[in-house]
A protein has these predicted regions:
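NAD(P)H-binding glycine-rich loop region in Rossmannoid oxidoreductase-like domains
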Residues: 1-10, 21, 39-41
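Catalytic helix-loop patch of NAD(P)-dependent Rossmann-fold dehydrogenases
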Residues: 9, 13, 43-92, 96, ...
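Substrate-positioning beta->alpha
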Residues: 96-102, 116-139, 147-149, 163
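Mid/C-terminal beta-alpha module of Rossmann-like enzyme folds, strongest
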Residues: 140-175
Length: 175
């Protein structure tokens, strides 16, 4: 994990720097990857809608929501600017080295066991699907001529931890 201060030291100046750089080079579109953590620590995050109340409870969620506001201010500073904000859940895929990759390694190595509620649903998605969704939403934004588009990205329905484990074991040939 990261120190709490690192989220603020990275996400807030990062947003400010990106917006300033975009102005300097006359870039008229920013795609910002935020997080569903802006909704708070709730198992219902997978069912949250884009207009759901944001109540981040972690430094990561707070810093990302603050960064969203910085990007929104950038967009509002010029009507020609376009902003696309995506709020993904846990993203997994090749070389991601996060929780899903650790779970795959543990299951394939036959040393995986559940330490929590197997029914907990994990909001998230595959990295290539996230990229495809961004391209789709850029086209949508252009077709509707919307200055700012914000959307959540998760599998629907969100699989449970047990669903993940069973699928990994099946694909990996582990019984």
């Amino acid at each position: 994990g990261h120190e709490k201060s690192e989220y603020f030291a990275t996400n807030i100046p990062g947003a400010e720097n990106v917006c300033e750089w975009a102005k300097q080079i006359n870039c008229d579109r920013i795609i910002f990857t935020s997080t569903i953590a802006v909704y708070g620590a709730t198992e219902e995050r997978a069912t949250m809608r884009e207009d759901s109340l944001t109540m981040p409870l972690t430094p990561y969620g707070v810093s990302k929501l603050t960064a969203e506001k910085i990007h929104i201010a950038w967009q509002k500073s010029n009507p020609a600017y376009k902003l696309l904000i995506v709020r993904p859940g846990v993203i997994f895929g090749p070389n991601e080295k996060g929780n899903v990759s650790r779970m795959v390694k543990a299951i394939l190595g036959r040393y995986f066991f559940f330490t929590s509620n197997q029914g907990v649903r994990k909001a998230g998605g595959y990295v290539k699907e996230l990229c495809e969704s961004i391209l789709f939403m850029m086209d949508y934004q252009d077709s509707k001529n919307e200055p700012t588009v914000l959307y959540n990205f998760t599998m629907d329905p969100a699989p449970s931890v047990q669903d993940f484990a069973k699928t990994i074991a099946k694909v990996g040939g582990v019984k």
